[in-house]
């Protein structure tokens, strides 16, 4: 395979993990970061100890503080940043891009102020003439396991399947299997909203409830995700795939999940401010819950689990009381509630 340069915007766990994959595939990954300490550590020690402790990076993984240097000559630019920084980084990227480039984003969330998906934010901020294609790379994955080269599967979603296949070719190897899909909306809705349900799974575990409760929460949570997704144009089949149920399972059941860990602390009685301070990293489900709370009301979509998690996060609702209210809702036929 011909070596290609790929720029990765974001020196966090996911950006660094994807850089490792690209280096394993004999490509030339360059990470753009904004902290001297992390950039220098990647270049000098070949580690990123804050985000991926105990992982040794291939020497081919490079990092820079210069956006221009990172994207110069890159076939693909991967945007691997928290959703709250997406708009400002895309403004910078729009100024820096000199020619049409394949853009890939791996950020899972909804912008609360606008209810826009991340691809919509990117499209607003980066000129169409500079976007050769926009691909969503998503699925059931923890960066830590990708960096350990454990078997993982993702899906590259794009309206232009040729572009999705290019991304597939750059990242696929014996440790990371990539599928393609043309349902960008479904991939983004599944990836964003599962973080809310993962908070709920963590809360359930923190309260001491068992597997029955978590299985019910995940299943009914997926019903809510599908309901909203279909309302905004997703293919319902997408939610039975990697970016739907696959991503939900891994995020709700793993101690690697930031959203599960945050929910677990909430379930044990800590308040949101304490939890976020202890986490020290972005918990996307908190921001997404705020966005979807208003979005569901605007669309008149019934999302009782999401509403309950919002109330626990932002209205100091007692978690056990929230569960009691959910369990006491009027009876329904299951298939009519999807």
From Swiss-Prot:
HAMAP family: NAD_Glyc3P_dehydrog. One of its GO terms (biological process) is phospholipid biosynthetic process. It is found in: Cytoplasm. NADPH binds at residues 13-14, 108, 143, 258, 282, 284. Its main location: cytoplasm. The active site is at 194 (proton acceptor). Sn-glycerol 3-phosphate binds at residues 108, 139, 141, 194, 247, 257-259. Belongs to the NAD-dependent glycerol-3-phosphate dehydrogenase family. Pathway: Membrane lipid metabolism; glycerophospholipid metabolism. One of its GO terms (cellular component) is cytosol. Keywords: Cytoplasm, Lipid biosynthesis, Lipid metabolism, NAD, NADP, Nucleotide-binding, Oxidoreductase, Phospholipid biosynthesis, Phospholipid metabolism. NCBIfam families: PRK00094.1-2, PRK00094.1-3, PRK00094.1-4. It comes from Listeria monocytogenes serotype 4a (strain HCC23). Disulfide bonds: none annotated. This is Glycerol-3-phosphate dehydrogenase [NAD(P)+]. The gene is gpsA. Signal peptide: none annotated. Coiled coil: none annotated. Its EC number is 1.1.1.94. Catalyzes the reduction of the glycolytic intermediate dihydroxyacetone phosphate (DHAP) to sn-glycerol 3-phosphate (G3P), the key precursor for phospholipid synthesis. The lineage of its organism: Bacteria, Bacillati, Bacillota, Bacilli, Bacillales. InterPro entries: 6-PGluconate_DH-like_C_sf, 6PGD_dom2, G3P_DH_NAD-dep, G3P_DH_NAD-dep_C, G3P_DH_NAD-dep_N, NAD(P)-bd_dom_sf. GO terms for molecular function: glycerol-3-phosphate dehydrogenase [NAD(P)+] activity; NAD binding.
């Amino acid at each position: 395979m011909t070596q290609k340069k790929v720029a990765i915007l974001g020196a966090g766990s996911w950006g660094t993990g994807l850089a490792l994959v690209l280096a394993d595939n004999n490509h030339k990954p360059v990470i753009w970061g904004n902290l001297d300490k992390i950039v220098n550590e990647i270049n000098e020690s070949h580690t990123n100890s804050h985000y991926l402790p105990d992982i040794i990076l291939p020497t081919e993984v490079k990092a820079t503080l210069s956006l221009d240097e990172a994207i110069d000559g890159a076939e693909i630019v991967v945007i691997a940043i928290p959703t709250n920084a997406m708009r400002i980084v895309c403004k910078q990227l729009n100024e820096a891009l000199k020619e049409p480039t394949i853009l890939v984003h791996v950020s899972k969330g909804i912008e609360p102020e606008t209810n826009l998906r991340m691809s919509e934010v990117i499209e607003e901020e980066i000129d169409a003439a500079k976007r050769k294609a926009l691909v969503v790379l998503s699925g059931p994955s923890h960066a830590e396991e990708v960096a350990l080269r454990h078997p993982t599967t993702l899906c590259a979603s794009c309206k232009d399947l040729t572009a999705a296949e290019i991304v597939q070719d750059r990242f696929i190897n014996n440790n990371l299997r990539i599928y393609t899909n043309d349902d960008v909306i479904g991939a983004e809705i599944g990836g964003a909203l599962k973080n809310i349900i993962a908070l709920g799974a963590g809360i359930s575990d923190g309260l001491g409830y068992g597997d029955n409760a978590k299985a019910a929460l995940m299943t009914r949570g997926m019903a809510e995700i599908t309901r909203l997704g279909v309302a905004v144009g997703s293919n319902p089949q997408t939610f039975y795939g990697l970016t739907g149920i696959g991503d939900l399972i891994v995020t709700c059941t793993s101690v690697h999940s930031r959203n599960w860990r945050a929910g677990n602390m909430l379930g044990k009685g800590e308040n949101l401010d304490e939890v976020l301070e202890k986490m020290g990293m972005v918990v996307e489900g908190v921001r997404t819950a705020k966005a979807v709370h208003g979005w569901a009301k605007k669309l008149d979509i019934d999302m009782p689990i999401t509403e309950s998690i919002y109330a626990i996060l932002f209205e100091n609702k007692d978690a056990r009381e929230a569960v009691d209210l959910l369990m006491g809702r009027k009876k329904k036929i299951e298939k009519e509630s999807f």
